[in-house]
From Swiss-Prot:
GO terms for molecular function: GTP binding; ribosome binding. This is GTPase Der. It comes from Chlorobium phaeobacteroides (strain DSM 266 / SMG 266 / 2430). InterPro entries: G_ENGA (IPR031166), GTP-bd (IPR006073), GTPase_Der (IPR016484), KH_dom-like (IPR032859), KH_dom-like_a/b (IPR015946), P-loop_NTPase (IPR027417), Small_GTP-bd (IPR005225). Residues 354-437 form the KH-like domain. Belongs to the TRAFAC class TrmE-Era-EngA-EngB-Septin-like GTPase superfamily. EngA (Der) GTPase family.
Length: 437
């Protein structure tokens, strides 16, 4: 198990910038607005051959509004989970009441853990002198660092990782987890869905749209299969995306889809499917990811025996050529169909990686050609000789014929639909390639 380092401190002391400095990437959203990192964000890191997990947290606010209190709860959970606590303060704003409160909490309640205290933004000789005042927090060795230029960070990492027991060589996993990106517009219930699955208030949830700004990874096991759930900030219409925070959050959603095997696209049952939902679905399809549509908050819809069938018909008519994507009616609140959603997503992931023998494909081709002969505008006959599957992360099939230019769009769509139906390739993009032979 990799050791977990949690960066904690009051808002706007530079926790996310230090997180990014250590990982050498813009992984957490960094902005001058206090409280921008609202949740816990975990990423793997390595220093001098030693592997670890680094956790960024929302700012610790002893008192505040509902979001601040939720951030406080998440920070306390992070502290309990961590092997090492990195307490960060800001030399430019000086030692504050909140800094002292955090210091007392750590030294009284979590004295059994490895705690390192660092003063950030120490970038000039005068600031180094100012940082000496932080000794009064009670920590014997404050580290003076700058997340912006990297000074002092190497020494801090050396000492933190040297404080841990010698790591055993990391084992290589034979069975990789299935990566599921939970995506959708703001406030459709993505975090509530993840929390209900994990059985803990892992992500900040409130009625305020956009309370989950980062993509957050959570790992769990079901039926001996490991899963990674990637929860993201909801995608908004472009006109509503402000420069800075919302831009990076939308980019995070895009990257989450890029990382996943299956995108769980969630919509609110009360509002139905909208154009923005279709943009998210198309984003996943264009990246050849598996897709499962989740109709959340189904418990809030007045219904009779025909409601679900009528609702599904309306959704599929809106989806057009993507109507092959499976959908489930769920409720994160009542937990209706939550585990069925995970089981279906796993089936889609397996469909996406399925390998079909050439003999089975050509038996299929013979039956398909007997059912529908390809027509052409020129009158010249299109002759498909055989087909095979090409090595790829999703189903890609190669057809060898006399002239690929003769292929009509409707016949291509016929073959695609028949392949998906015959080999039960539910929820996955099927790519067809035609070559002259």
């Amino acid at each position: 198990m990799k050791p977990l380092i949690a960066i904690v401190g009051r808002p706007n002391v530079g926790k996310s910038m230090l997180f990014n400095r250590i990982l050498r990437e813009k992984s957490a959203i960094v902005d001058s607005t206090p409280g921008v990192t609202r949740d816990r964000h975990i990423s793997p890191g390595e220093w001098q051959g030693k592997q670890f997990l680094l956790m960024d947290t929302g700012g610790y606010c002893p008192e505040g509004d509902v979001i601040s209190m939720a951030m406080l709860e998440q920070t306390l959970m992070a502290i309990r989970d961590a092997d090492i606590i990195l307490f960060l303060a800001d030399v430019r704003s000086g030692l504050t009441y909140d800094d002292l409160e955090i210091s007392k909490l750590l030294q009284r309640t979590f004295q059994h853990k490895q705690i390192f205290f660092a003063v950030n933004k120490v970038e000039t000789p005068q600031l180094s002198i100012d940082a000496e005042s932080f000794v009064s927090t009670g920590f014997t060795k404050p580290y003076f660092v700058s997340a912006r230029d990297g000074s002092g960070v190497a020494e801090l990492l050396d000492d933190m990782l040297d404080s841990l027991p010698v790591q055993e060589k990391q084992l290589v996993e034979k069975d990789l987890p299935t990566n599921l990106a939970v995506v959708g517009r703001p406030n459709v219930g993505k975090s509530s869905f993840v929390n209900a699955l994990l059985g803990a208030n892992r992500l900040i949830v409130s009625d305020i749209p956009g309370t989950t700004r980062d993509a957050i990874d959570s790992r769990f096991t079901r039926k001996k299969q490991d899963f990674v759930l990637i929860d993201t900030a909801g995608l908004r219409k472009r006109t509503k995306i402000d420069a800075g925070i919302e831009y990076y959050s939308s980019l995070r959603t895009d990257k989450a889809i890029e990382r996943c095997d299956v995108a769980l696209v969630m919509i609110d049952a009360r509002t139905g499917i909208e154009n923005q939902d279709m943009k998210i679905i198309n984003m996943a399809v264009e990246r050849k990811r598996g897709v499962l549509l989740l109709i959340n908050k189904w418990d809030l819809v007045e219904k009779d025996s025909k409601t679900s069938a009528h609702y599904e018909k309306e959704v599929r008519s809106h989806m057009g050529n993507l109507a092959y994507i499976p959908l489930l009616f769920i409720s994160a609140l009542t937990k209706k169909n939550l585990y069925r959603a995970i089981d279906t997503a796993q089936e889609i992931s397996e469909n996406r990686s399925r390998k079909i023998t050439t003999s089975a494909l050509n038996r299929f081709l013979e039956v398909a050609l007997a059912e529908k002969h390809p027509s052409t505008k020129s009158g010249k006959e299109l002759k498909i000789k055989y087909m095979t599957q090409i090595e790829a992360p999703w189903p890609v099939f190669a057809f060898f014929c006399n002239d690929p230019e003769l292929l009509q769009t409707n016949f291509r769509k016929f073959l695609e639909n028949k392949l998906r139906e015959h080999f039960k390739l539910e929820g996955v993009t099927v790519s067809l390639r035609f070559f002259k032979k």
